[in-house]
C-alpha cells in the first residue's frame, strides 16, 4: 500500500492533502478521517488542525484542487481547436479524461457531503461551470448553435460528460480501457452537439 512520505518543514499542508487523496482512493470520501490522514503523513493526530478546521475542510480543498485542475484541462484542450464547436468538444473530452486521470479528486468533487458550504470549493466549481457556459455562448454567438436557453444547453452538455465520467470511474461501462472510454466519449459528445445544433 503506498504511503505518503513524512512531511518536511513548510509543506505540511501539501503532505496532508496528498495523504487525503490516498485515503479517498482506498475508502472513498465517506471513509475519510483526519486521524488516519495524520498517520499517513507521519505527523501527530493534532497536526492537521493547523491547516484544516475539520475533515470536511480538507475534503473541500481536495475537491477545489480538482475543480481547478479540471477547469485548466478544459481550457487547455479547447485551445487546440479554432472553432467554437471544436472547443466545446475538446472541453467535454477533457472532462472525461480528467475523471479517468484523477478519480480520487473526482470522487471528492461530487461524492463528498457538505461541500456546498465551502466558499473556495463553490468558487472553483462555479468557475469550471462558467467555462462550459462560455463555450456554449461562443457557439451561439458564432451561429453554430441556436440562441437561447444557454444555461439549459450547458446543463445538458455537462450531464452527458459527467454521466460518462461517473460510469467510467465506477466501472459501470461494459469496457474498461481508457482509450475505449475516451473514444466512446467523443462519439457521444458528437451526437449530443448535433442534437443541440438541431434544437429549435
Where do the PLM segments sit?
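Amphipathic alpha-helical segments used for helix-helix packing
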Residues: 100-116, 166-174
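N-terminal intrinsically disordered/low-complexity leader segments
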Residues: 1-11, 81, 197-200
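Helix-turn-helix
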Residues: 15, 19, 23-57, 61
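Amphipathic C-terminal alpha-helical segment
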Residues: 138, 158-176, 191-200
Amino acid at each position: 500500500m503506498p504511503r505518503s512520505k513524512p512531511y518536511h518543514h513548510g509543506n505540511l499542508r501539501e503532505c496532508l492533502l496528498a495523504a487525503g487523496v490516498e485515503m479517498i482512493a482506498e475508502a472513498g470520501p465517506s471513509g475519510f478521517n483526519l486521524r488516519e490522514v495524520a498517520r499517513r503523513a507521519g505527523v501527530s493526530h493534532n497536526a492537521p488542525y493547523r491547516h484544516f478546521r475539520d475533515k470536511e475542510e480538507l475534503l473541500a480543498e481536495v475537491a477545489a484542487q480538482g475543480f481547478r485542475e479540471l477547469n485548466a484541462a478544459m481550457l487547455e484542450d479547447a485551445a487546440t481547436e479554432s472553432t467554437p464547436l471544436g472547443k466545446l468538444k475538446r472541453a467535454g473530452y477533457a472532462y472525461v479524461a480528467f475523471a479517468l486521470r484523477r478519480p480520487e479528486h473526482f470522487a471528492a468533487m461530487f461524492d463528498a457531503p457538505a461541500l456546498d458550504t465551502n466558499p473556495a470549493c463553490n468558487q472553483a466549481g462555479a468557475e469550471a461551470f462558467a467555462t462550459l457556459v462560455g463555450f456554449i455562448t461562443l457557439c451561439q454567438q458564432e451561429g453554430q448553435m441556436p440562441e437561447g436557453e444557454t444555461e439549459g444547453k450547458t446543463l445538458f452538455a455537462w450531464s452527458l460528460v459527467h454521466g460518462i465520467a461517473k460510469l467510467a470511474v465506477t466501472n459501470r461501462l461494459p469496457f474498461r480501457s481508457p482509450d475505449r472510454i475516451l473514444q466512446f466519449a467523443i462519439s457521444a459528445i458528437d451526437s449530443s452537439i448535433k442534437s443541440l445544433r438541431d434544437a429549435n
